[in-house]
Amino acid sequence: MDLNDLKFIEEQLGRKPNDVEIGMFENLWSEHCSYRSTKKLLSMFGKTVKENQNIVVGPGDDAALIKIDDETDLCVAMAMESHNHPSYIDPYNGAATGVGGIVRDIISMNAKPIALLNALRFGDINGEEKDKVRWLVEGVVDGIRDYGNRIGVPNVGGECEFDKSYDYNNLVNVVCIGLVKEGDIVTGKAKETDLTLILVGSTGRDGIGGASFASKDLTSESEGDRPSVQIGDAFTEKCVIDSTLEACATKKVKAIKDLGAAGITSSCSELCYSGGVGAELYLENVILRDEGMTAYEIMVSESQERMLLAVEKGSEEEIIKIFEKYELPVSIIGKTTDTKRFFVKMNDEVVVDLPLDLLCEATLTDSEEKETILETPDNKENIAEPEPAELNNILLKLLKSPNINSKKWIYEQYDHEVQLNTVVRPGKDASVLRLKEAHPKALALVADCNPTYCKLNPYGGSLNLVCESVRNLATVGAKPIGMLDNLNFGNPEKPERFYQIKKCIEGLADGAEIIGVPVVGGNVSLYNETVIDGKDYPINPTPVISIVGTIENINNIPKGAKEGDILIITAPTKDEMGGTEYYKQIHNTEEGIVPKANLEVEKEIYSKVCELVNNGLINEAVDCSKGGLGVAISKLCMTNNIGVELDLGDYNTNGLRNDILLFSESSGRIILSVDKNNADKVVKELNGAIIGTVKGNELKIKLNDNELINLPIEEMKNKYENAFSEMMGENI
C-alpha cells in the first residue's frame, strides 16, 4: 500500500490499522476495485443516461437493468468484466473464472443468464512470441468453452484480434445478459438492519490478492503470481445459478452480492455501504476448504462460486435448505447493523472495526496527461506499391489475415444453441436471441473495438467505435437500448496512457450521447503493461464496447441474399486509410488519418436501415468496417454462398485509386441486398447508391471497363475459413 494512503487512513482512524485491515484497504483501494484513476472521468457517461425512463438499475450495481417490454415488465440485465492478468498467467482458469464471475453478476440481480459474448485480444500470432500466443489462445478458448458449455449459457458471439502490443498482456473481456421481470429484481443494496447474512460456497486460499495483482503492471516475475489466479468449477456454478434463483423466488432475499475481487471484504462492504447499513461478521462460521486459514486470508480470498445473501430474519432455515438441496456449502456468517461500520470477529477476537465510508471511498488520484495523437498525414509515397495492379491476391491475403479471417475455430467449440433461443449465430455482424416471453420481440448483441484507431486518435477512434457497433445492430433491425464499456489500457500513472484513457472515454460518451444510447455499466482494466529489461510494453488503448438492442419483430430480420437481388451501399467511400487492415497487412504501416465519423449522418443511416429491415425490405445487410468494401462484399458472398457482380464506376464519385476504393474503412457504410422491385424505394430512402447485383458463383468487381476482382467464391471461402487453423499450426 502507498505510504501516503496508509498515513491518511491512520489519520482518519486515529490509530494504526492492523494487518487484516491493511489487507482490506489494499484490495478495496486498488485500481481494480476503486477506479481511483478513472472515477472522475467515468462521470462523463452520466449525460447519456439522463431522463431515460427504461433504465431500471443504472451504473453502480453488479449489473444494469433495462426494461424491454411494458406488457410483460421484462427487463434485460447486462454486465461486462475483464479477466486480463489472470488469463495471461493461467489462461485456462483465468478465462473460465472470468465467465463464472460475470454470470454471477447477472444472477445477483435475480436474472436468468441467457447469453455470453467474449472479446479477446492476443499478441502477434505470426511474430516472435507466436508459440506463447498459440498457447494462450488454446488455453483461453478452452476455459471459456468448458465453463460456458457446462453451465448451460450459450456463447453467441464476440471478437478475437491479434496485435504485437498484446504479446505480454492478452485481454479477456466477457459480457453476459439475462432476463428478469421488474417486480422480481433483487439488487446488491441491503437497506434494512438486522438482516441475516448467508454465505454460499466454501472459502480457500485460491485467488488471494487477486484485486491488487490486477492493479499493477506485469513483469518477468509475474509467473510467481499464479496463486492469485482463481480456480473455477463449472458444475458448482450451475448449482449456484439454479439455487440462487430458487432462493430469490421465495421473496425473502433482500440483497445479493457475488463474491469476486477482494472476496468477502468487497461483497459485504459494498452490499452494506450502498444500502446505508453496517455489517457484523463471525469468521469462525465461514466454511473453509483449507485448514488453518487466517482472518486476512478469509477476508480477501477470491474462491469462486460464492454468493452473499442478505435475507429476512426468520427465513434462514428456508433459504439454507434450498442451497443444501443442491449440496452447496452454506452458513450464516453475520448480520446487518445500524452502525455503518464493518465489524468482524473470529473466535471472539475483534479483527476488524472500520467505518464503511472510509473503507469504500478510496481517495482519488489526479494523474497527469500528455497529448498522444499518433495519426499523421497520409504519405502514400512511403508505401512501396502506391497502386498495385493485381488486387485478387491482395483481397485473398486480407481474407486470410488474423483480424479478418473466420473465427469458426473458436466459436464452433462453444455451445451457442443451448436454451434454444439463438436465431442469428456467431460469425455475423450481430447475434440475435428470440424472447419467448415477449414474442415477436428479440434481442441483438454486439461487441466491438478498433484499438489501432484508438492508438492513432483516441477520441476519433472511440467515436468511430460507437458508430460501428450501432451499424452492426442495424443489420438485423435492432434499436440500441444500452451500452457497456470495458476500458483496457496501460499504466495510468504515465501521462501518455492517461491521455488515451481520457480521450477514449470522451469519445465514447459523446458518441453514445449523440447516437442516443445510454452507457449503463462496464469495467476498467488498467496496468495492462509489461516492463522487460527496463522497457515498457503497453497494450494499444482498447475500449471494448458491447451494445444490446431490441428488435420489434423477429420475423423481419434479413433471411439472406438471393439470386437477382440488387446491391446498395449507404454512404460514399473516402480516402481514409490510416489504421486500416489493408495498410497493416499489405504495407506493414499504420500511418495516415483514421476514418472520421459524422455522428448525425450515422444516426440517420442506422435509423433508416432499421426501419427498412423492420418493414421486411432488406434480404441481407453487411457492415463495411475492417477490410472495407472488398472484405464486406466478400463476406456477403461467402455467408450466403452466392456470387456478386459489382460495377463501381458510378459510385466512385471521389475518383479514388482502386485499392483505396476497395479497402478504405470509411464510416457510415452498410451494403444491402434487396429485391429488384424494392431497390428504387430503398435507394431513395437512404440516398444510397446501387453498386451491383447478386449473380452466379464468383465475385466480380469492375470499375467501368476495368476489372478489379474476379474470384470464385469457393476459393475465397477456403482461404477465409481455414486461415485460423493454419495460424494455430494445425494441418488442414
From Swiss-Prot:
InterPro entries: PRibForGlyAmidine_synth_PurL, PurL_linker, PurM-like_C_dom, PurM-like_C_sf, PurM-like_N, PurM-like_N_sf. One of its GO terms (biological process) is 'de novo' IMP biosynthetic process. Belongs to the FGAMS family. It is an enzyme of class 6 (ligase). Pathway: Purine metabolism; IMP biosynthesis via de novo pathway; 5-amino-1-(5-phospho-D-ribosyl)imidazole from N(2)-formyl-N(1)-(5-phospho-D-ribosyl)glycinamide: step 1/2. Its EC number is 6.3.5.3. It is found in: Cytoplasm. Keywords: ATP-binding, Cytoplasm, Ligase, Magnesium, Metal-binding, Nucleotide-binding, Purine biosynthesis. ATP binds at residues 35, 485, 522. This is Phosphoribosylformylglycinamidine synthase subunit PurL. Mg(2+) 2 binds at residues 105, 258. One of its GO terms (molecular function) is magnesium ion binding. Pfam families: AIRS, AIRS_C, FGAR-AT_linker. Substrate binds at residues 82-85, 104, 230, 302-304, 525. It comes from the Archaea. One of its GO terms (cellular component) is cytoplasm. Monomer. Part of the FGAM synthase complex composed of 1 PurL, 1 PurQ and 2 PurS subunits.
